[in-house]
């Protein structure tokens, strides 16, 4: 199918120009496409990108949360910068070539398996790529990221990446700054994940959920060098730096505050948290030196203490305060945190050396020999303070003294040892010429005078020093040239170069005065790192070698020995000050030296015999020799170099002029240029300690191993000279292997170890992904195929429907010739069958048939239509739309056959009179159902969270918390008080017990039910009566409230007892309830029409049994007929015709209906029985047993009554005896009945309790005997009734007299109901031709469906006659028993209640025998009654009445206004107000007719005295 069709089926939205403009309007954008730079198209259901050609100026396009499967349609969007395509169905990155300016691309939550087509050649400025939640899984899917040179933000979270080789890809992304990998398996598989990625990505500033701080990177680099110990140390350095920053900021604030306060009120500055006392400074400094492998403080002293007289004096005071409160380790950490230009490189020293040499050379050229001698001495003195500090694993300090002669050398060596340099750091004393030279005391200042007086050596000294000056100047230049190329020359010239630099540094150091020595290392370090240091400035202005002694410029150039002496004294004073400071720093060196020795032995393999000396100075020298890897070689080279220099001096010093000396020095310096370059490289390596520590390069990696970025941060030096030939000489470090190399080996080993596993897992995952993708493709294809077929079906149906409409409109005549189309009749939904107006009529057809007589259901219509489509398309086509082609005519005929069988049976069963009575019954049924529901709910109101109250005669819910009134919730279908014909649960069928048993399917014909119930009743009743009598012997005092409920008017009693409006389950009980109601309707119809002698042959009996047993399966197949069913229908039709004949004779025997009040019979003060009027008789038509309510004068228990109802779990008939104020039902407690005249208690008989089998037999689903027995049973019942009357006369003293109550009612209401029912029948008849063929209609017209009005009149006459007979008999019994009989007749309306008038009176409802000829009972039943009467005379009548009523309940009374006879006891009769009573004497004549209804068998005269209000 084409793409367009598929879009229509899936319901996705097309991206049209009109729709785009509407979206622009909605988002308040421009209607002119080219004016918009942003377009919001998200959450629109688009499947493809199209029609964007006019939006040429778009810079931002939002397309997330659509159904886009391909990137396309962007050819004109050349200015697009941001494209958002997350939450779509994209599988490949493509078609982005036109968007050359694309900066941000979001492809999250798609189906992408490989990153491609986004390289710099396609998207040259792509900066951000978000591709989270896709199907990326290995390094191959990410390999194209290497081509994204400008990509700086990459989000790969929540993919399936598990390949650790992706680190190699990230290493090649030089601009990657933000990386998100969380949610991938590789995060847990990559060892030291965060450190590894920080080291791999040099520019990374953000990793996953947090930034990459400089501290993180420094710690990662330290971990790479020295492992976890190095990381810990680096972390501690950063912590100290942070603390020092905080402390310095606080101290700065304190100093500013103190500047405005008098001295006595100033606050002290904060001390270091590491040292609370100045006495701990030495210890802290040594710990720092041991940790960091350096002595930075000495380096700072040497390199920084050169302040000018102008600037140094102004800052000394504040700097002293700072220095006093800061420990040396904090100063070091401060340098760590401020990584700028490398302070440690000896740039200033080199420049100072060159400046001093230039000054010396200039002085040599401009002054006479005596002045030269003085300058040389000064230069020699200045060389005494040269100190070289180098940071290695073993810290070392080389303090080398190079005097002009032996005495000078000895004095300087003594000075070095007295100043205590060796107490802080390793001090190497380089022995020159004479190793056995004695050490002289520092105090002997006279030695300096001897140096001056020895003029015979000055010329040679000058020659040597002038040559050295040129050598050092050339060495400094070479040093700067060799620093960047990171290469070594040979190790042969280290001694001479170090000696020269030490002389220079020492000269500058001892020139400092006392005030300048106290300045902090920070300030002076910054000053010395400046490109234009104070030394050079001072030299330019004053042309002085020593800038701190500008005031002595003139005197120095003078040949006066006094100035020279003063200068030497000042130098000695400065040395003393430095010695004192160094001793202060190194007070606690002994313990630290032991630690230093131990750490040194671990790094450099040493022989223990080298540190065997016990002398302090000798131990220190030996320790320095062990710690310094260059020391032995330096010593030897130093000696060689010095020897060579002295030989040159001796050979050139004698007899040369100043000019010749300059020429000689210049020539020889040219010859030694190459060697000096080697010295410069050695010196560069010797001074590399500070940069290594500051930048974390490590103690085992020298400057030539530095990373490029660290090299770029060093001081800018001059041109680079490459000497690759000599590189290998010092390539390797002294130690065996660095931690960096070890880490590399470990990484390589791990990579090799995991390579195979990675490859295998990658292959497995790749196969699984391919399989999943293949399955996805198959499923997608199948979906499209299904939608394609459905589309074709819809199109075909649509076209056919159009053709049908045209054909039905224009060619209506053709319908009769060929059944191409069918008349559907009115199409109604399943909920529209019932009438909505009164009166209510029973349904013509059971719901199982979907009421085809009134209109087909939608399902039937659709089936018919499908068949029509089949015949229209191709009559010969065997299959169309998956259905077998059938003609609609066949289905119509099948429906007609159904109507002929069961539907017509029900029509015959219901006459107009029965329908009219049913209307009245349903009205009363509704009233009683509502009353019973409300009363039971009210009685159980305590069970609910909210209470139920009666408000204005309406049951309302009272909220417990707020007290608000609310209507009751709508009841479920089981409790619905609507009179819909679909709702027939008022007469449900239940079995005894707990109500959990549900009956099977509905019987097909009501006659089967009735016959079966009679057969089972015959077998069980005798046993039941005996069981009841035996139980009464032991439970005479028990009372069971059997006050009649309306005839199955509502649900069974157990349901109402369990009713909880909050937990109504209408699905469980509604279906069986409806089925029971249908059964009841059939039974009722049969009782009205078929109560006479129906003799059926064997064939009919068999047919009924078969039909009944298969009714369950027929309900779901109402449209399918078979020959067996047709036979059944034919037999049933015959039975119906015969039934009509019996019905005509039956109506002749029926009595005239009268609406009578309740009749109560009493003997003395005891109420015998009470018969409810009207609805009681109506609703007893289908009762399986009657419930007799007897009075217990001893005990009344409402709970027992309820228990009885639950045990029977069957519909109870209620006598609705009400007053205007109160409603009585079986939940209302009955008070104890007392005979106020005699004071005696009346014996109460328990009602019979029927077993479950007996009750179930009333609704049995099968036939167990031939239906001919029914006739015999009915005849026996009639005979026993006559015998019963004669037996009562034989026992007059034990029989209770009856008081008859008779009231004639108007027939107006009955006639109105009858007219309404007939009107409905007329409507039904009018529509029958739509469904039935003419033949069937003609047959129906021949049948009689109702009786005439004349027949109704005869019925009324018969009823009156029957009542007369009963009254006459009752009067005779009354006269025979006692003269104390009080015959009281009270006429009440439906709501009157005798218990209100007579306080504690108890009454019981008893169903009246109003049709003796229609009430058969078994001989066994009546014989059992007579046997019990002999055994227990006091209980005989109640038992007999119970059995008779039980038998009577199996038959249906005439559906007209009924008669009620009630017996009762009236102990409070004498207490009633006579004003409200009226007594009349009534005489009646009764005629007993024969079975045919036309012969008078007997005439009786009845006299009664009636009292009423």
Curated annotation (Swiss-Prot):
The record lists the organism as Drosophila yakuba
Q: List the disulfide bonds.
A: none
Where does it reside? Answer: Cell projection, Cilium
Q: Give the protein's function.
A: Cilium-specific protein required for cilia structures.
What are the entry keywords? Cell projection, Cilium, Leucine-rich repeat, Repeat
Q: Which example biological process does GO assign this protein?
A: cilium assembly
- Would you identify the family this protein belongs to, as annotated? Belongs to the DNAAF1 family.
Q: Where are the LRR repeats?
A: 34-56, 57-78, 79-100, 101-122, 125-146, 150-171
Which intervals carry biased composition (Acidic residues)? 978-990
| Principal location | other
Which residue ranges have biased composition labelled Low complexity? 309-318
Q: Which Pfam families match?
A: LRR_4 (PF12799), LRR_9 (PF14580)
| Protein name per the record | Dynein axonemal assembly factor 1 homolog
């Amino acid at each position: 199918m084409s793409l367009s069709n598929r879009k229509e089926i899936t319901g996705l939205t097309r991206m049209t120009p009109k729709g785009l403009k509407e979206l622009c309007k909605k988002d308040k954008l421009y209607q002119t496409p080219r004016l918009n730079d942003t377009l919001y198209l998200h959450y629109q259901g688009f499947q493809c990108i199209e029609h964007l050609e006019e939006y040429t100026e778009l810079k931002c396009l939002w397309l997330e949360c659509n159904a886009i499967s391909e990137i396309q349609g962007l050819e004109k969007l050349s200015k697009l910068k941001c494209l958002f395509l997350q939450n779509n169905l994209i599988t490949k990155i493509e078609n982005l070539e036109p968007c050359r300016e694309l900066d941000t691309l979001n492809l999250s939550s798609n189906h992408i398996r490989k990153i491609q087509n986004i390289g710099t050649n396609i998207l040259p400025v792509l900066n951000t790529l978000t591709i989270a939640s896709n199907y990326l899984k290995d390094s191959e899917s990410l390999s194209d990221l290497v081509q994204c040179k400008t990509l700086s933000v990459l989000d790969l979270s929540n993919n399936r990446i598990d390949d650790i080789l992706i680190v190699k890809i990230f290493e090649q992304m030089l601009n990657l700054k933000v990386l998100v990998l969380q949610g991938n398996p590789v995060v847990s598989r990559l060892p030291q994940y965060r450190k590894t990625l920080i080291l791999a990505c040099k520019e990374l500033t953000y990793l996953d959920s947090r930034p990459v701080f400089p501290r993180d990177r420094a710690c990662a680099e330290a971990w790479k060098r020295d492992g976890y110990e190095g990381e810990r140390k680096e972390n501690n350095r950063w912590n100290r730096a942070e603390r020092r920053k905080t402390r310095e900021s606080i101290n700065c604030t304190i100093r500013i505050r103190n500047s405005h306060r008098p001295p006595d009120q100033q606050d002290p500055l904060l001390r270091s948290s590491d040292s609370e006392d100045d006495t701990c400074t030495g210890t802290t400094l040594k710990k720092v030196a041991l940790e960091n492998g350096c002595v930075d403080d000495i380096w700072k002293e040497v390199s920084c203490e050169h302040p000018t007289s102008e600037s140094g004096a102004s800052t000394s005071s504040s700097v002293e305060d700072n220095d006093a409160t800061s420990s040396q380790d904090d100063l070091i950490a401060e340098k760590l945190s401020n990584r700028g230009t490398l302070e440690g490189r000896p740039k200033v020293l080199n420049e100072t050396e060159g400046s001093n040499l230039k000054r010396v050379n200039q002085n040599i050229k401009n002054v006479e020999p005596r002045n030269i001698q003085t300058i040389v001495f000064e230069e020699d003195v200045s060389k005494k303070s040269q100190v070289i500090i180098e940071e290695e694993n073993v810290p070392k300090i080389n303090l080398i003294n190079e005097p002009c002669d032996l005495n000078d050398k000895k004095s300087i060596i003594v000075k070095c040892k007295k100043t205590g340099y060796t107490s802080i750091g390793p001090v190497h004393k380089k022995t020159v010429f004479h190793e056995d030279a004695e050490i002289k005391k520092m105090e002997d200042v006279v030695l300096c005078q001897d140096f001056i007086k020895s003029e015979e050596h000055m010329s040679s000294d000058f020659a040597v020093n002038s040559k050295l000056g040129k050598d050092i100047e050339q060495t400094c230049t070479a040093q700067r040239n060799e620093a960047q190329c990171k290469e070594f020359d040979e190790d042969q010239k280290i001694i001479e170069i170090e000696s020269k630099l030490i002389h220079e540094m020492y000269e500058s150091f001892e020139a400092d005065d006392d005030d300048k020595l106290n300045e902090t290392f920070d300030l002076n370090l910054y000053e010395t790192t400046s490109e234009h240091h104070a030394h050079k400035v001072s030299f330019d202005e004053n042309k002085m070698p020593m800038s701190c002694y500008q005031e002595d410029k003139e005197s120095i150039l003078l040949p006066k020995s006094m100035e020279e002496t003063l200068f030497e004294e000042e130098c000695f004073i400065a040395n003393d000050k430095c010695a004192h400071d160094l001793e202060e720093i190194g007070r606690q060196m002994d313990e630290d030296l032991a630690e230093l020795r131990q750490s040194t032995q671990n790094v450099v393999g040493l022989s223990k015999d080298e540190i065997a000396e016990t002398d302090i100075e000798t131990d220190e020298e030996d320790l320095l020799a062990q710690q310094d890897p260059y020391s032995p070689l330096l010593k030897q080279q130093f000696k060689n170099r010095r020897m060579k220099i002295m030989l040159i001096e001796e050979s050139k010093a004698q007899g040369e002029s100043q000019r010749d000396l300059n020429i000689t020095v210049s020539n020889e310096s040219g010859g030694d240029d190459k060697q000096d370059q080697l010295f410069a490289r050695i010196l560069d390596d010797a001074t590399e300690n500070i940069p290594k520590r500051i930048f974390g390069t490590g103690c085992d990696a020298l400057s030539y191993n530095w990373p490029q970025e660290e090299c770029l941060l060093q001081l800018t030096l001059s041109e680079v000279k490459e000497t690759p030939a000599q590189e290998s000489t010092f390539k390797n470090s002294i130690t065996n292997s660095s931690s960096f190399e070890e880490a590399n080996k470990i990484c390589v080993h791990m990579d090799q170890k995991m390579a195979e596993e990675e490859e295998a897992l990658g292959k497995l995952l790749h196969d699984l992904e391919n399989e999943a993708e293949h399955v996805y493709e198959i499923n997608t294809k199948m979906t499209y195929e299904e939608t394609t077929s459905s589309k074709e079906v819809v199109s075909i149906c649509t076209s056919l429907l159009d053709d049908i409409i045209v054909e039905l409109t224009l060619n209506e005549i053709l319908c009769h010739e060929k059944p191409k189309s069918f008349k559907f009749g009115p199409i109604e939904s399943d909920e529209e069958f019932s009438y909505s107006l009164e009166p209510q009529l029973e349904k013509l057809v059971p719901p199982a048939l979907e009421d085809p007589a009134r209109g087909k259901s939608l399902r039937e219509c659709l089936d018919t239509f499908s068949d029509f489509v089949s015949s229209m398309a191709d009559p010969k086509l065997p299959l169309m739309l998956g259905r077998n082609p059938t003609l609609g005519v066949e289905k119509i005929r099948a429906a007609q056959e159904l109507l002929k069988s069961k539907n017509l049976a029900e029509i015959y069963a219901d006459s107009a009179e029965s329908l009219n009575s049913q209307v009245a019954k349903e009205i009363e049924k509704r009233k009683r159902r509502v009353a019973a529901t409300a009363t039971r709910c009210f009685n159980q109101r305590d069970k609910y969270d909210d209470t139920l109250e009666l408000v204005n005669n309406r049951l309302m819910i009272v909220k417990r918390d707020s007290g608000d009134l609310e209507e009751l919730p709508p009841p479920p279908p089981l409790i619905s008080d609507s009179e819909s014909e679909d709702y027939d649960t008022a007469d449900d069928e239940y079995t005894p017990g707990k109500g959990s048993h549900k009956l099977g399917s509905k019987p097909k014909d009501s006659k089967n039910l009735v016959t079966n119930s009679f057969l089972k009743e015959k077998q069980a009743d005798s046993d039941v009566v005996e069981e009841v009598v035996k139980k009464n012997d032991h439970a005479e005092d028990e009372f069971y409230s059997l006050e009649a409920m309306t005839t199955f008017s509502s649900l069974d009693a157990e349901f109402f007892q369990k009713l909880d409006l909050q937990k109504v389950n209408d699905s469980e009980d509604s279906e069986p309830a409806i089925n029971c109601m249908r059964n009841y309707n059939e039974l009722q119809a049969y009782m009205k029409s078929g109560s006479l002698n129906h003799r059926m042959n064997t064939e009919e009996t068999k047919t009924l049994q078969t039909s009944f047993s298969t009714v369950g399966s027929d309900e779901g197949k109402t449209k399918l007929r078979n020959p067996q069913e047709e036979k059944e229908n034919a037999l049933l039709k015959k039975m119906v015709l015969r039934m009509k004949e019996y019905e005509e004779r039956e109506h002749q025997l029926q009595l005239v209906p009268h609406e009578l009040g309740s009749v109560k019979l009493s003997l003395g003060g005891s109420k015998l029985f009470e018969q409810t009027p009207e609805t009681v008789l109506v609703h007893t038509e289908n009762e399986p047993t009657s419930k007799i309510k007897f009075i217990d004068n001893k005990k009344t228990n409402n709970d027992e009554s309820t228990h009885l109802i639950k045990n029977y779990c069957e519909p109870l008939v209620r006598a609705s005896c009400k007053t205007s104020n109160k409603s009585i039902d079986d939940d209302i407690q009955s008070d104890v009945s007392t005979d106020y005249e005699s004071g005696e208690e009346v014996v109460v008989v328990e009602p019979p309790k029927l077993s479950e089998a007996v009750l179930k037999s009333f609704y049995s689903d099968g036939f167990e005997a031939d239906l001919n027995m029914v006739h015999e049973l009915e005849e026996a019942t009639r005979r026993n009734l006559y015998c019963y009357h004669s037996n009562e006369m034989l026992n007059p003293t034990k029989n209770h007299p009856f008081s008859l109550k008779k009231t004639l009612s108007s027939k107006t209401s009955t006639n109105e109901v009858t007219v309404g029912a007939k009107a409905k029948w007329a409507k039904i008849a009018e529509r029958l031709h739509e469904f039935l063929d003419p033949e069937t209609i003609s047959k129906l017209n021949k049948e009689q469906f109702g009786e005439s009005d004349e027949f109704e009149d005869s019925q009324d006459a018969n009823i009156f006659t029957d009542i007369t007979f009963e009254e006459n008999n009752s009067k005779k019994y009354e006269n025979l028993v006692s003269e104390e009989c009080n015959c009281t007749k009270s006429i009440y309306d439906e709501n009157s209640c005798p218990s209100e008038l007579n306080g504690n009176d108890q009454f019981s409802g008893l169903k009246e025998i109003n049709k003796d000829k229609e009430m058969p009972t078994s001989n066994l039943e009546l014989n059992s009654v007579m046997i019990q009467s002999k055994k227990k005379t006091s209980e005989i009548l109640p038992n007999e009445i119970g059995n008779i009523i039980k038998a009577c309940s199996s038959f249906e009374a005439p559906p007209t206004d009924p008669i009620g006879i009630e017996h009762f006891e009236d102990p409070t009769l004498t207490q009633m107000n006579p004003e409200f009573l009226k007594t009349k004497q009534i005489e009646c004549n009764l005629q007993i007719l024969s079975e045919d209804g036309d012969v008078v068998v007997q005439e009786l005269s009845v006299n009664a005295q009636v009292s009423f209000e």
